[in-house]
Amino acid sequence: ILQDYEVPAIEKWKIEDISPDERKNKLNEIRDRLVMKQYKVGEWPLFDLEISELEDVTILHISLDMLIADFLSINIIVDELEDNYFGDKKKTFTKELSFRDVIVYEHNRQKHPQYSETMKKDKQYWEERISTMPEAPDLPVKEDLKDTSIRQLNTYIEKERYLELQKLADDNNITLSGLILACYAEVLAYWSNSKRFSINVTMANREQVHPDIYSIIGDFTKINILEICQDYNLSFIQRVQFIQKQLWNDMEHMSYSGIEVLREMTRLKKKEVIIPYVFTSTLSMVSRKESTNHKGNLIYKISQTPQVLIDCQVMEYKEGILVNWDVREKAFPKKMIEMAFRTFSEMLIYTDTQNMLADKNVIKLPSDMKEIRKKKEVNYPYIPQLLHEGFCES
């Protein structure tokens, strides 16, 4: 922890007395610049704050490197900024615990004989599975991925639907995060050539070793390489429960990290294995009161991670749930992501949930999408033949 440091100055922009289009362009310029900003690892500060003053509202822009703060930490930062800005100061700056304390604790714990035994069992659990674990979903991805621009698609689950989904999850012995994860997997499988694949699920590794553990800032992220196997002989709720059970099993063996799993998969397959489809949920990590008691409004947010193509993020906001995909925009065929996200959103928001759970094929394309697919379908008789036979016939 730095003993001596200077808090960087906050850049202030006055965006007044201009047309709505000019205002929008100016805000987009600020956002794009902050999104693309590269921070030097190990060099203070790894964050930036700027303010835009409009005629009727003030916008605080926050940019940071997620090496210093995971998604839950960002919520903590925003909550504390808001509390102080609106004069509702809590006892947030008298914490007994620091992120450094957690790192030291973890380092010392790994030296304990009991932890060594846990590590041994967890390593065995993963090594027995790694050789048969599938790679990422086989979606139609363009080979040239030089364009790294990120686009966000989002949807909001209102309070009434949120409570309906929560009850549905409780009644079926699954978590709400697990249900949303299963919807994400269902959509990936629909557009994937393979129905058996792995997803990168980020976990907040905040063990309750201290009362302050959920109020400190740092990167507590661990990743889990979650195997998905879509068996369409099962109902959707059975597939959800299968995914939930697999996730719970994996979570019991987290001392062997997802990074180590990927490293071993790479070694066995003799090629670099990347799982670029990510799922992150902070549901139930903060109290409902904290997640709904915001005075300000979240206008824009986006994240980018090297090699990630789609990052599905789920968080409580106001009285509902905000769900977004941060997508590598140029990686996929035109309109595919819009169709996939629309399908995903409709599963969460509009679908008759009870019927969906009992159904085997839960993805129902809207009529306009069905028409597009129908036009592109061409049925030719399939005649099996050897590779050289077509050449000889010509």
Describe the predicted segments one by one.
Residues 32-35, 78, 166, 177-185, ...:
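Short amphipathic alpha-helical segments
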Residues 24-30, 74-75, 101-104, 120-124, ...:
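AMP-binding/adenylate-forming domain of the ANL superfamily
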Residues 72-81, 177, 195-202, 220, ...:
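Extended, hydrophobic beta-loop-alpha segments that form or line the acyl/peptidyl-thioester binding
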Residues 107-112, 248-250, 265, 269, ...:
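Flexible, non-catalytic linker and terminal segments flanking ANL/adenylate-forming cores
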Residues 1-4, 27, 43, 56-57, ...:
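His-Asp-centered acyl/peptidyl-transfer active-site segments
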Residues 52-100, 333-352:
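Active-site-proximal acidic secondary-structure segment that organizes catalysis
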Residues 1-25, 29-33, 37, 43-45, ...:
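Short amphipathic alpha-helices and their capping loops
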